[in-house]
């Protein structure tokens, strides 16, 4: 079974910055941030985690089996750029970002979109972003 990108590495700095902005857009630390709804998952975080959960890491991707470690690292960096783009503050205004993510998910999943399940569905972030990044079945 192939390892997914989330099992190997993530660009946490970009995800954390975008998630902090999503919690308090434009105002920075503010008293309204004292209490957040417990199930509220920031949308940039949901996008990044879903993408990394659906995409194969280059180290276990059959297309990269004969590649050097450096080439695999370059491919991982390319996937990280997609995650950073998905995590941007205004990512929803850039359809090409979601097109790139969708294409990568299809490539990793053999051309067939996976079903994404969220049995707890707290604030609805995961189903919403699953549809947006990969147009996956929820």
Where are these regions (language model features)?
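Short charge-dense sequence patches
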Residues: 1-2, 100
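N-terminal-proximal low-complexity accessory segments that begin disordered
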Residues: 2-41, 45-48, 58
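Short secondary-structure transition/capping motifs
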Residues: 35-39, 68, 115
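Class I S-adenosyl-L-methionine-dependent methyltransferase module
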Residues: 39, 58-59, 132-137
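Active-site nucleophile-adjacent alpha helix/oxyanion-hole segment immediately C-terminal to the catalytic cysteine
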Residues: 49-53
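Short, glycine/acidic-rich hinge or "gate" loops at secondary-structure transitions
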Residues: 59-70
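Conserved S-adenosyl-L-methionine
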Residues: 72-74, 78, 88-137
